[in-house]
Amino acid sequence: MMSDLRKNIFSIKIWTVTTFCLLSLVNMNASNALAHSLQKDEIKEVKDNPSGKKVTGKVLDEFGEPIPSASILVEGRSRGVITDLDGTFVIEVLPTDKLVVSFLGMETQTILVGKQTNIVVKMQPQTAELDEVTVVAYGKQRKASVIGAINTVSMNELKMPVAKLSSGLAGQLAGIVVMQRSGEPGAGADFWIRGINTFGAGNKPLVLVDGVERSMDLVDVEDIASFSILKDATATALYGVRGANGIVLITTKRGTESAPKINARVEYGFTNPVRMPELANTEQWINYYNDITLESSGRLAIQPEEKAKYLNNTDPDLYPNVDWMQTLFKDFSNTTRVNINVTGGSPKIRYYVGGSFYSEGSVFNISDKDRYDASMRYNKFSFRSNIDINVTSSTELSLSLSNQYETKNRPYGSLSDLYAYMIRTSPIATPTIYSDGTLAKPSTGTNPYNSLNNSGYSQDFFNNAQSLISLTQDFSKMVTPGLKANVKFSWDAYNAHTLNRIVTPSTYYATGRDEEGNLDFVRSTEGSDYMKLTRTNSGTRTINFEASANYDRLFGEKHRVGALFLFSMRNYTDNFPGNYVDAFAHKNIGIAGRATYSYYDRYFAEFNFGYNGSENFAPDKRFGFFPSFAIGYM
């Protein structure tokens, strides 16, 4: 266990986050350093031994095609060259030297020079690289055979000290536009893939977690096994109209056949504002105001003796001097993240169980906590369990359960309005609160301090429960090799509950002092000393059903054929309809298919289609056909 101080500046959220990682894994591998050196743009020949002989050569792939920019290094020396566009190279070496030939995606070869003066190197692809699979629409494909535009994000890049996964996407992938609309604790971000492709509100990408449409922000980053983004028509056609804005595929971790392994991670960090608007101070504001009134009316609105009272704080009740930024914001707040997961299993049963807690405070400065606590804070508890059971040698049953419980405490009202009031209120408009405890409010405008400390508070409670059951049958021995079928059913429940405790106290404006020096007040607003309670409930229920057949087979070491046919259905209902219902139907149904072919894993062809329908459209426009075709060469 080690402590690691990490500093990350998030310009999207406008916070600086310094995270102390109490538990982290550091992998140092000398071969990685060599691999990076081989991928430099240019490796210049170093003539440190003029007595050597000159050797020419050519680097070819497994099909005899030249490989440009392949790296040739002399083992144990700082000498090397790269091949030209024809795959040829020239290097000066000794007969006892060994040449290390490498290229991205190919097996590295080491060749003894000896008496050779012309060397032909035939590279072979890395077997692991070709056999590696990547997550695609409705399943997985060998990475070498994927034609569509699919990007995968490393899990280390997603492990940001943020509350929601969407907030950590900024800058991780080309073509992803991320917008953080709020800096509140627990706030997520909106993002788009290759811009906005749909008019109206429904312009966000489709997010699928383990093949089920769900929110990305409900997944803890420690539970993610793979994160892929589908960008073009070839990759998204199977989802039809729902894939018009791109697709995010998230696969969660599952158990492996091994002894139980426990992983724990604890983070504690700080957040503080790093970029705030620069507001005029009291002296600057008075000067600007006097310049305006002098230009328009020929006289000063604030005389020099009054200006001195504002600047000297001789009577802050009648001549306030308030820095609203310093008053309403603290220097920093803290964040805490704790995650623990257990994975393991036997040949029959494999499991992954994980839980996490996240807490984030706010930099808003709540100074009055005597009657109630309106401080802003966010807490999230997450749980996930994935279990895979081999019912028979060819039948697998998978059960996934997850739950996310979130709580948020905040001042009542709109924080965006509070921010606007803070910007618009002048430093001499009103004190935060009068010295005798009377609530202050200017004759015109508002007091941002009251909006933060004396308007009440709200409590939000959110609960998301998700379940998924999947049954996979391998028909390779019963029907034909490479044939599998899968049935998947999910049921999700979302509930939200908000309690608003509202206070509308009377506020006053001081006009001067009486003979005894007491403040004279004029009532600005008439309120009540009682607290009012309101509450709202909302919730949804979502059912997904999917049945598919998949075929993947290699014939004669040359021809690889794949096919997929799928039926899907989704039903979404509002569990707490209000007085206004925007739509009655939230149902989608459709079929999809994919056919793939590759020759020697070098030439590829792929056809996809989606035929989808929705009750949100007119009866004669409910279904649409969305095909795509692609060919590729590697």
Residue ranges, per PLM feature:
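Short loop/turn motifs that connect adjacent beta-strands in outer-membrane beta-barrel proteins
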Residues: 255-260, 347-348, 363, 394, ...
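Outer-membrane beta-barrel transmembrane domain signature of Gram-negative proteins
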Residues: 179, 320-343, 429-440, 503-618
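Flexible loop and strand-edge segments within Gram-negative outer membrane beta-barrel domains
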Residues: 273-275, 316-356, 360-363, 374-448, ...
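Residues on the lipid-exposed face of transmembrane beta-strands in outer-membrane beta-barrel proteins
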Residues: 252, 264, 340-346, 385-389, ...
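Transmembrane beta-barrel architecture of outer-membrane proteins
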Residues: 164, 188, 245, 335-339, ...
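Flexible, surface-exposed loop regions and adjacent strand-edge segments
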Residues: 279-285, 369-374, 414-424, 500-511, ...
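Transmembrane beta-barrel strands of outer-membrane/channel proteins
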Residues: 264-270, 355-357, 399-403, 487-493, ...
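Short, small/polar-rich motifs associated with maturation and membrane association
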Residues: 1-383, 397
